[in-house]
C-alpha cells in the first residue's frame, strides 16, 4: 500500500513538473513576440522600419474597404505622430490583396523590412488584422493622444503570417460583477 501511494504521488509530481516546463516555453514565446494573439509564424530580423513625415501608405486597389483601413490606421497613429500618412497607389506601407488559399479569408502576411512594410491578404479583413498587429509592434507611445516629439517610430523587422484558428472570435466581459462605462466596453470591443 505504501509503495503504491509513493508511486502515485511521484507520478503526480512528475506530471506537474513536465506540465510546468511545457507552459513556460509558451510564455517565453508570448514575451518574445508581445503580440496578441500570438501569430502562427513569426521570424524577426535585425532591421527596422522607421516612420517619418514622408512615410506613405500604398493601396494597390482602389477598394473603398482598403481606403477605410488606411484611414483607420491614420486615425490611430495621427495623435501621437502629429501628422497623417499620405495614401497613394504605391507607398512605404503597402496594403495588397492577393490570392493565397493558405491565408483564408481573415489571414494575412506582414513583412517589415528596412525600407518597406507590406501587408498581404485575400480579403480586406486580413489587411485589417495585419494593421492590428502592426499597431502592436509600434512603440507604446503610439497610444498617446498628444504629439510625442522625442520618440523614434521604429518597427522591428519581422516576417509574420497569421490566420484565425477558428471561424469565430470571443472573449468574456462580465458586467454583472463590475460596472463598466460605455467607453470602456467600446475600448474592450476594439481590442478584440
Question: Where are the model-predicted features located?
Answer:
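Repetitive helical segments and hydrophobic/amphipathic motifs
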Residues: 11-12
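Bacterial N-terminal signal peptides that target proteins for export
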Residues: 1-8
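A conserved hydrophobic secondary-structure block that centers on an alpha-helix together
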Residues: 174-191
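Hydrophobic faces of well-ordered beta-strands that scaffold small-molecule active sites
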Residues: 169-173
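Contiguous, structured surface segment used for ligand recognition
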Residues: 22-166
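C-terminal motif of bacterial Sec signal peptides marking the signal peptidase cleavage site
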Residues: 17-20
Amino acid at each position: 500500500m505504501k509503495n503504491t501511494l509513493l508511486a502515485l504521488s511521484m507520478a503526480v509530481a512528475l506530471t506537474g513538473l513536465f506540465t510546468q516546463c511545457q507552459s513556460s516555453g509558451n510564455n517565453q514565446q508570448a514575451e518574445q513576440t508581445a503580440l496578441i494573439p500570438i501569430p502562427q509564424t513569426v521570424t524577426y530580423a535585425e532591421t527596422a522600419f522607421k516612420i517619418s513625415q514622408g512615410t506613405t501608405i500604398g493601396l494597390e486597389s482602389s477598394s473603398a474597404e482598403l481606403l477605410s483601413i488606411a484611414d483607420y490606421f491614420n486615425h490611430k497613429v495621427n495623435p501621437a505622430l502629429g501628422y497623417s500618412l499620405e495614401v497613394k497607389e504605391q507607398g512605404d506601407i503597402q496594403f495588397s490583396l492577393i490570392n493565397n488559399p493558405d491565408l483564408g479569408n481573415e489571414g494575412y502576411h506582414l513583412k517589415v523590412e528596412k525600407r518597406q512594410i507590406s501587408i498581404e491578404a485575400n480579403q480586406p479583413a486580413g489587411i485589417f488584422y495585419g494593421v492590428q498587429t502592426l499597431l502592436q509592434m509600434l512603440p507604446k507611445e503610439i497610444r498617446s493622444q498628444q504629439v510625442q516629439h522625442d520618440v523614434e517610430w521604429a518597427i522591428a523587422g519581422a516576417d509574420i503570417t497569421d490566420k484565425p484558428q477558428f471561424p469565430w472570435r470571443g472573449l468574456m466581459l462580465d458586467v454583472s460583477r463590475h460596472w463598466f462605462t460605455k467607453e470602456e466596453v467600446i475600448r474592450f470591443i476594439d481590442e478584440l
